[in-house]
A protein has these predicted regions:
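Catalytic cores of nucleic-acid ligases and guanylyltransferases
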Residues: 1-209
Length: 209
């Protein structure tokens, strides 16, 4: 069942934007690039003191990731909707899906925030991605134990992808500058996976998440 079908009206959670798969990063200017971390896609919703962490399939993982909940609760705005990835890292600082998959590691999960969809009642979905990123950076500022910004790279996506593969990351996601936020699969978000990453070898990963 989809997130759109399972979410109650008024909850303030939307179906996330999904990157389109590609064999190589887009070339030329007009794109920003980010590391794709191997974790659980999360929509983090805060309304006053209430925080919800919802997966892309509509599962409520709020109780599973207490550190992320605490961090979201500590941010300065009263109401917002963040898009991100909950991860648990190994001793090398690499996100490992098998660690977050098992509930015994949930207390260590950190939210990697990469988009801001709503802020204090303002719908930002039609706002260009670079402006949403700036507003997100103002919201998630300074060291936080349970939430960090996903670093953004501009320039040659092939170079970042090569580094991501060397480090053992899942891959990268490239996003077109000026693009808006749209639920479902988007041609303006492009993902390229490291062929040697565990995520590529894992069967039915999307069914679990």
């Amino acid at each position: 069942m989809s997130l759109r079908e399972r979410t109650r009206p008024g909850l303030g959670i939307i179906e996330p934007c999904l990157p389109s798969p590609a064999k190589a990063p887009p070339s030329g200017p007009g794109w920003l690039h980010e590391i794709k971390h191997d974790g659980v896609r999360i929509m983090a919703r805060r309304d006053g003191a209430r925080v919800r962490l919802i997966t892309r399939h509509g599962n409520d993982f709020t109780a599973r990731f207490p550190l992320a909940v605490e961090a979201v609760s500590a941010l300065s705005a009263r109401s917002f909707l963040l898009d991100g990835e909950a991860i648990v890292t190994n001793e090398r600082g690499l996100a490992v899906f098998d660690l977050i998959r098992h509930q015994r590691h949930g207390d260590d999960a950190v939210l990697i925030a990469f988009d801001l969809i709503e802020l204090d009642g303002e719908d930002l979905r039609r706002t260009p991605i670079e402006q949403r990123k700036r507003q997100l950076a103002k919201l998630v500022r300074g060291p936080q134990a349970g939430i960090v910004l996903n670093e953004v790279f501009e320039g040659d996506g092939d170079i970042l992808f090569a580094h991501a593969c060397k480090l053992g990351c899942e891959g990268i996601v490239s996003k077109r500058l000026g693009s808006t936020y749209r639920s479902g699969r988007s041609p303006h978000w492009v993902k390229v996976k490291n062929p040697k990453a565990p995520a590529v070898k894992r069967e039915a990963e999307e069914d679990w998440r």
